[in-house]
Amino acid sequence: MRKLYLFLLLTVSWVAQAQVIRGTVVDDASNDPIPGAIVSIQGSPIQAPTDFDGNFELRGMVPGLYNVSVSFIGYEGKTQFEVQVTQAKAAVVNFRLREALQVLDEVVISTQQQFKQEAQSPVSVQSIGINEIQRNPGGNQDISKVIQSLPGVASGVAFRNDLIIRGGGPNENRFFLDGIEIPAINHFATQGASGGPVGMINVNFIRDVDFYTSAFAAQRGNSLSSIMEINLKDGRTDKTGGIFQIGASEVGLTLDGPLSKKTTYLASIRRSYLQFLFKAIGLPFLPTYNDYQFKVKHNFNRNNQLTILSLGAYDVSVLNTDQNETPEQRYILNYLPEYDQWNYSIGAKYTHFGPGGITNIVLSRFMLNNESYKFENNNRDLDQLLNYASQEIENKFRLEHQVKKSRWESMVGFGLEQAKYNTQTFDKRLPGGFILDYETDAIYYKANAFANWVGRFADDRLKVSLGLRTDIVDFNESTRNPLNQLSPRVALSYNLTENWTLDGNYGRYYQLPPYTALGYVGTDGDNSDLTFIQAEHFVAGTTQYWPWNAKTSIEGFYKRYSNYPFLLRDSISLATVGGDFGVIGNQLATATSDGRAYGLELTYQQKLYKGLFGIAAITLV
């Protein structure tokens, strides 16, 4: 989709910020500033030291893309790729450096250090920056469509954002914004899955994305195929700026700036006018979507931070019954219901950097309201064929404590959740004259605990990660037993040379079936015997890092599924549905479906080097 961008800068003195990169360099474990670190432009003589507070400023660049590196004796160096310098505002780059195992007289940043690699997830992770997202062909400024182009990722149909990872199902993915879970990231979301036709997240807010297709950290649960960690920018600290955007299908406004000396914000609203376009070209359905997003970050001091963010949407689709001339139009009008759906996620994360480690406290709430209805011949005076109303509410608390040392690091924590699900369902459109007519009002209480340890050996050539997690839900006897959901995770990474690694991972992961399945109560029975779905992952691979800011990796994977709900009315596994609109899982099911997926991935990723960048991948599943 081609878009026309109109920029409304809400300041008058923006020229003074032209061609500047500024930011801070801090210790990853303590958040203390690192004075005297050298920040430089890769391939350029431009450099600057950090001051006593860890701040730096680089000047003298013309607008364009730059790689920014930082080095300091006693710490591992880092590089931030593709930092965009413009005349509109200063580019902001912040670095967190980890203490090095070996203290050398001179710091040399290896190509491997330039790429993000975590010891607990040495395989099956792709990290992409904002410029890679914005320039993605066909991505349309939509993070899910960009992710669909990564290794191991497939999509269902072209007009939807479903993520099918390494042969899994579209309902096996989890999403986090700055560490806060966001269950819905798409408009017109499929209840019981995660896909939809249009993304909700404003990509102008994104700093970078880490996408895991295996090797999940122990603090991440309830996922079988992928974890998407979306890291957001902070608002501007100097003045307020904004972008007013008119596209082919929507209009939006984005603002960011300071609320006070210690508080910044990002905020956006968006509304589509697809209904006018669809009506003009004669389509029999008229969708409209609206969304908002904001983030507020407050720094009490260097050791205490609070982040509050929210994302929400309101989506409506009505029928255009005047467009009924062709057989195709009449067919769509005959089966397509009308939709009314809204959802929001809101969360707060408090971070404390202390002498004993880093503590995160996360509170969040999610609510989905989903309604759809259908009348015979689309006439409200005739019989009602479908009347569906449902709500999902999740209230979550998570506490995690992390200790980082040069030779090892650890994390422990736990989570508590309350989930509410209610529905009033009437549907007489089903095959064989079956009528679905039931009500559910359920509350589920959940808890989880997790621990992870990472050790570095043989002068940092060998990294070992050991993790364990368990989840419980008060649904039935099986889900209440924590031993039934023990989730061990093991990862190994060994440097054969400075820039060549051998990596492997094993993990057992659990995910609760959707509330639509847990809460089903029909004349044919209920789903009280369902339990957690299990998936075991085996991954092995090797990565070669090249001096021209590139890496080549090859990975083999094997996934084994068990206890997947088998939908009795449709005679199909729940894993194979979810790539369409509406609701999935609201029928009688048994936890008897098993499966497997295996394949091979070959990836070449080129970060910015002499104007060249890109990614190429081959996936065999």
Predicted regions and their residues:
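Predominantly transmembrane beta-strands of Gram-negative outer membrane beta-barrel pores used
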Residues: 174, 208-219, 225-233, 240-284, ...
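Face-selective signature of the C-terminal outer-membrane beta-barrel domain
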Residues: 297-315, 336-479, 488, 546, ...
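Outer-membrane beta-barrel translocator domains and adjoining extracellular loop/strand segments
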Residues: 278-283, 313, 318-327, 363, ...
